[in-house]
Amino acid sequence: MGPAPMVKPRRARRKSRRVWGASAAALVIAAGVTTLPTAPAQADNTISAADQPYFAYYHLDQARAKGYTGKGVTIAIVDGEVDTTAPELRESDIHDKSTCEVTSSASSKTHGTAVASILVSSVYGVAPESSLLTYQIPAPSRGDSASPSCAETQNGLSKVSVPWLLNQAMNDGAQIVNFSASSSLQGDELKWTVARALTKGVIITAAAGNEAMDENSSSLSQWSGVVGVSAIGVDGNRQDYSSWGQGVATTAVGGPVKTHDFATNQIVETSGTSFSSPIVAGVLALARQKWPNATANQLLQLLVKTGLNPDHTWNQYTGYGGIDPGAMLKTDPTTLPDVNPLADKGNGSSPTPDEVQQYADGVVNPLQIVNDNSYAYRGFDESLIADPMVTVPTHLGTSPRYHAK
């Protein structure tokens, strides 16, 4: 899968594959580039709920009628540019929080706008009243470019690297983060970013891929606690393009989805796990609204225990089965264990529970922490006090693990 977003036209999935810069090494810097103005979508170029099969499949009209809209929940996406002038998004609460200036291609804007619309469109979004924070990540192979300010790095990672953007979303208060792209990036910085999410109760959803193969090693879903999402059709069957792997936790409808193609100014039909992933993120937002006293761990327990596989058993193709919004909105998760059911995905998934506790206790080397405004070092390494590369507060010897009774 490589560092590619998962946009897959129905008849040319492999040919449409894009490569996203996920690390400083992959980022192409273009001097003097600024964000291009967004051209308004044509007023008559509209997409309705009836055009989106998933809307009827998940009975989202009934959810809205009962007041389940995701109101009060903040979702983030790390993706292409979102065109908020698209008719279906004009009433949505969307905020571009990109960390630097990125010029998006028509292809990237098509992808980002589609993902955002599935989440919060007032017309056919899963969680239409959630607030959406958007963070642009460039795809150089499609003509995206980033301003020189994006190259300012910490620990060798740019402001458009995956750890930086995920942490920025958490800095800005996101409760759920959707990542409809691939990332084979390893390293401590991403590990501690995921550990932060697990510690702070932020749920990350990630697309499994569209290459009809085991893509665990190139999906963010390989990481402990991340909700990997594969794709089914409205017949409930796994789609032939959908990838699989140890990180898959659930599955959702991946298409066909209608979206604006900004290269042709036409409405096109497409499919992919890029679109099943935000459906899951949106349903989790509905559950977060419905069950405000539940922890993130309990919401994930709810996801697992209401999965549509027989007896909620797990397999690498559909995880615990298709997501069931109706069951998630009827079943009180506060009675479920406050333990993340995805914390150990087997095969040595990372971060381990011990590593998550290291982060929570503040004993992780701060030189491995990137763009995290919540972390403070509380270990005993005095050399870190004077280290100019340390950007987080240091409070030596104050870790709770040293003072536990």
Regions found by a protein language model. Give the residues of each.
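Hydrolase catalytic cores
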Residues: 137, 254-323
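C-terminal subdomain of the subtilisin-like protease fold in secreted/lumenal serine endopeptidases
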Residues: 240, 291-404
